[in-house]
Amino acid sequence: MIQNQIKEQSLKVKMCGMRRKEDIAYANEVKPDAIGYIFFSKSKRYVTGQQARELDQNLDQKILSVGVFVNEIIEKVTEIANEVPLDVIQLHGDEDVIYIEQLRQQTDKEIWKAVRVKDTKDIKEAQQLPVDKLLLDTFTEEKDMYGGTGKIMNYDLIPKEGIRKPFFIAGGLHSKNIKEITEKVHPYGIDISSGIETDGCKDLKKMKEIMQITGGRHE
């Protein structure tokens, strides 16, 4: 058992970038609160709706399935959300209020919005969005880079008075820094991908380690 567990037992854990049967088997073993499928074709963790549906058939029903979309047309988002089916739609691109409101009219699924944080203004504006939860991620100038950078966000940008909406943090998280970061910013949850991989593939040992550190549901 890893020492110095995070005391806050309610910290949610989302493990993103599932694309192999082994990934789902690992998730079923360690039991994070949610897993993510990435439907952005430029991502190295990209899966199709059909692939996600086949993977999701073997996922423990207690684990939420989250679909990550980047500037996708709304009809395609709802099509995949119903096909898999997904529990949550996560928007990770440049989707604005109008887009989100239109999506709301076409689905009853929970909607999360990722925000690439460059300054405090980004967070303040994100709190006004009609979404259920936020995901604060690292800002990058790289073209077509929407998350998955493995780089740590500047957590000093999070307002000291807190954030009104429940929020996940992402970007460069791994077993060596999660405890310190979560104790500093007190997020609703963490979203981790590269931090549970070895050579680009999900690593069961690292997944177990994260769940132990966060006091998660791993048994």
Give each language-model segment a name.
Residues M1-E219:
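Conserved N-terminal beta1-alpha1 strand-loop-helix module at the mouth
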